[in-house]
Amino acid sequence: MDSYVIQTNVNDSLPSVLDVRVNIGGRSSVQGRAKGRKARWNVRPSDMSNKTFNPIRAIVDNMKVKPNPNKTVISLSIGDPTVFGNLPTDPEVTQAMKDALDSGKYNGYAPSIGYLSSREEVASYYHCPEAPLEAKDVILTSGCSQAIELCLAVLANPGQNILIPRPGFSLYRTLAESMGIEVKLYNLLPEKSWEIDLKQLESLIDEKTACLVVNNPSNPCGSVFSKRHLQKILAVAERQCVPILADEIYGDMVFSDCKYEPMATLSTNVPILSCGGLAKRWLVPGWRLGWILIHDRRDIFGNEIRDGLVKLSQRILGPCTIVQGALKSILQRTPQEFYQDTLSFLKSNADLCYGALSAIPGLQPVRPSGAMYLMVGIEMEHFPEFENDVEFTERLIAEQSVHCLPATCFEYPNFFRVVITVPEVMMLEACSRIQEFCEQHYHCAEGSQEECDK
């Protein structure tokens, strides 16, 4: 039997040269001399970690400003509905979790894409004649964020590009660029309730475009696209043969004066990966259960995209099994009154905030129709001491102890985002402080003195 022997000088602890001797057919010969590795510590971060950049963290962490010690801090910046304790999930939801835990059935590993029974429940919950679903069309994930990550990873290669909204959720860029995927920004129009500039969107598409990301209802805008507008978006995607990643984590979280339309119900020709989860509608973001719904009635994705999602899901071996065990009861037993009460509160707060901020000179809020947010334009010409929205919001913290996210975090300068999940009394106080702040810093723009005198 042939043998391979590497001979070293045992007297040298760190040899610089190795003799490689090969014994073939009983004959020994020196095949070559290999250079050894000079041992030294050289641990460096990976390219992926160096490419990973979260605009919100980069901006907020550099806002080294202390709030006014004489005023209680009011945070309108955190998109977590549980922070203030005024929006608990329904008792049926927590009981479902307790029952799943007490059963002892869900302490082990599940398939990486989730239990079959849990995927069947999600498919049944979202199935409709216009967009039929089966368990094989559902991938369970660790929150909606991981659902988005898997969709980007399965659709795009390094060097390709994706189209994302401006303003838009910063995670899209963070994930894409860490994978070497280029990001192209399409514009949302505040004067049209944040509808997409469709002409500009289509101009961005080229042979390297891997997918179009559509977030509806929107974070940070609180906008909800009409059926007609969604059909126009789908027409662009169909014309250009670009699949859609639909971020629908706020699906059904729309106010009573408008209707939510899942994108997949409006097209049989465009393949759509819809991302959702429990976080927002059920008010449990920390439970980290999301899903991908695969809508592909023309079999454009074929088996390859489905298989790719399964393979990618195996990197973390699936989401929390206890939440999966509770999923059937959560989806079947949560009363409609819970959803209605949540939306009633959000709409009331949105109306209150919009009305109060609309009356403040220098601010231009855009009325929301759903989700948990409201965007406010700053007429910077009336606040000349501030260079941009970041400085404006920094001073708002320092003087009034009110935290709002500058919309530069969402690629949209000279706006700021307000979270409308805070208790009503806190919202009233925050709006009052914002008014006081603006009145103290407002200056008439050149040529508008007559308006200021009114």
Curated annotation (Swiss-Prot):
pH dependence: Optimum pH is 7.
Pathway(s) where this gene product acts: Amino-acid degradation; L-phenylalanine degradation; acetoacetate and fumarate from L-phenylalanine: step 2/6
Keywords, ordered alphabetically: Acetylation, Aminotransferase, Phenylalanine catabolism, Phosphoprotein, Pyridoxal phosphate, Transferase, Tyrosine catabolism
Temperature-activity profile: Optimum temperature is 55-70 degrees Celsius.
Record-listed N6-(pyridoxal phosphate)lysine modification sites: K280
Modified residues (N-acetylmethionine): M1
Reaction catalysis annotation: L-tyrosine + 2-oxoglutarate = 3-(4-hydroxyphenyl)pyruvate + L-glutamate
Pfam families for the chain: Aminotran_1_2, TAT_ubiq
Main enzyme class: transferase
Single Gene Ontology MF annotation: amino acid binding
PTM-bearing positions, type Phosphoserine: S448
Membrane-spanning residues: none
Enzyme Commission number(s) from the entry: 2.6.1.5
GO biological process, one term: L-phenylalanine catabolic process
GO cellular component annotations of the record: mitochondrion
Cofactors that this protein relies on: pyridoxal 5'-phosphate
Family: Belongs to the class-I pyridoxal-phosphate-dependent aminotransferase family.
Function: Transaminase involved in tyrosine breakdown. Converts tyrosine to p-hydroxyphenylpyruvate. Can catalyze the reverse reaction, using glutamic acid, with 2-oxoglutarate as cosubstrate (in vitro). Has much lower affinity and transaminase activity for phenylalanine.
Subunit structure: Homodimer.
Protein's recorded name: Tyrosine aminotransferase
Organism annotation: Mus musculus
